[in-house]
A protein has these predicted regions:
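Cleavable N-terminal export/targeting peptides
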Residues: 1-29
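Transmembrane beta-strands of outer-membrane beta-barrel pores
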Residues: 34-40, 70-74, 91, 105-109, ...
């Protein structure tokens, strides 16, 4: 299990955000996801193998939200739970356009040196979103990082949508790993595919995903760079 000190620190990050929501009424929901390859920012954290994820989400009044995700991560020498906690707030900027800001914390069982936190800001449209994440110590490697992403979901017909994603990860400062690609401090990842709605609360997605080289070096760099991922998500 994760050390109590790490759990307490991560929980405090979310609790700080929720304090402003007071006793407001909230909606709580969850999801269960199965994927042929669990990927984050184009890189596999399941060693190119199938994986399952459990998610819980809280939506409160005044745009406050928080949640948690539990998954299984495979490292070169270790494996264990991967926990993600997040919290933030959405505010309306103009009709059809919202802004958001929040915190996200990542923790890994048995390899706490990989734990890291990020702050993020974003713009949310009806069919798209744009976010930027900033970390002072990406994956505990001693480098600062900035990750920017654009996500699009475009309806094609009833129950079917095209999905797309492009992200850029840039690292700087600290000591660069000797395993990193010193020619480029930035890495791009893309995902293109389609999504099918299978009844209320169920979604099937098939997508091609790819990641370039460069950027901050992490334990995921040895994984396959291009693959096709099939995933099923069920909400409850």
């Amino acid at each position: 299990m994760l050390p109590p000190a790490h759990l307490a620190r991560l929980t405090t990050l979310v609790a700080t955000l929720l304090a402003g929501a007071g006793g407001a009424w909230a909606d709580v929901g969850g999801t269960v996801s199965l994927q042929t390859d669990a990927r984050e920012r184009g890189m596999s954290y399941s060693a190119n193998r199938p994986s399952a994820q459990l998610g819980l989400a809280w939506d409160g009044d005044a745009g406050w939200y928080a949640g948690a995700q539990l998954a299984h991560a495979r490292f070169s020498q270790h494996r264990g739970a991967a926990v993600l906690l997040y919290g933030g707030r959405v505010i309306e900027l103009t009709p059809g356009l919202d802004g958001e800001a929040g915190l996200v914390a990542h923790a890994y069982e048995n390899v706490s040196s990989y734990d890291y936190q990020e702050v993020y800001v974003g713009l949310l449209g009806e069919r798209w979103n744009l976010r930027a994440y900033l970390s002072p110590d990406y994956y505990g490697i001693g480098q600062r990082s900035l990750y920017a992403e654009f996500n699009l979901r475009w309806p094609l017909m009833k129950g079917v949508a095209a999905v797309g994603h492009v992200g850029l990860l840039h690292g700087w400062g600290g000591q660069v790993s000797p395993y990193a690609d010193s020619r480029n401090a930035t890495r791009m990842d893309v995902r293109l595919g389609a999504s099918w709605q299978l009844g209320a609360g169920s979604d099937l997605q098939l997508a091609w995903t790819a990641a370039g080289r460069g950027g901050p070096y992490t334990w995921m760099d040895a994984t396959r760079r291009r693959t096709v991922v099939l995933g099923l998500t069920v909400a409850f």
